[in-house]
């Protein structure tokens, strides 16, 4: 169905600012709609600026594009995963000052700590893709701050306490903390 500005909050441009989709992510997503070969180019040129893409009018679809928020979110995860932690900190902190005061307060306490948290598993071959928009950051970092950590020891699904104990006992035998 078509998006409705009354029924669908994502029909308003302000929605994307409030959710914290980075401008870079929106640009990447729009380019996937505009040129059919952009995604192939991006796979081959992961760190190249979008401006280096050889845009070709002949590669534009003749039919109108359909908006896909799931695709935007996926593109955004990829874009953010390639950002240095310092940039993720700066952009998410600036966003939080306006839209999520609790995150802004946590980050203001210790910027170096916040940047270090955001750098966890960011610089390897396969950086983590947990953050799709800045509104995801508080949940992502919450376990690192006493003010936001909520312990949860409930087992999910069909797991029993006996199974959990067995998994931990077996895991202890093979885990290498030096990895």
Task: Pin down the residues of each PLM region.
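Short, intrinsically disordered, charge-balanced linker/junction segments flanking boundaries
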Residues: 168-178
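Catalytic adenosine-cofactor/nucleotide-binding cores of aminoacyl-tRNA synthetases and other
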Residues: 1-165, 169
């Amino acid at each position: 169905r078509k998006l409705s500005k009354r029924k669908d909050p994502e029909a308003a441009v302000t929605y994307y600012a409030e959710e914290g989709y980075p401008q870079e992510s929106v640009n990447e997503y729009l380019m996937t709609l505009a040129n059919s070969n952009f995604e192939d180019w991006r796979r081959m040129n992961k760190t190249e600026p979008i401006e280096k893409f050889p845009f070709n009018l002949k590669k534009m679809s003749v039919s109108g594009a359909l908006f896909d928020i799931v695709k935007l979110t996926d593109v955004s995860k990829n874009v953010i995963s390639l950002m240095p932690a310092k940039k993720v900190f700066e952009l998410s902190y600036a966003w939080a000052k306006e839209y999520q005061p609790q995150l802004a307060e946590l980050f203001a306490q210790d910027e170096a700590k916040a940047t270090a948290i955001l750098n966890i598993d960011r610089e390897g071959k396969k950086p983590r893709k947990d953050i799709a928009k800045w509104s995801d950051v508080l949940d992502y970092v919450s376990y690192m701050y006493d003010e936001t950590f909520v312990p949860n020891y409930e087992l999910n699904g069909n797991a029993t306490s006996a199974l959990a104990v067995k998994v931990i006992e077996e895991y202890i035998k093979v885990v290498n903390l030096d990895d």
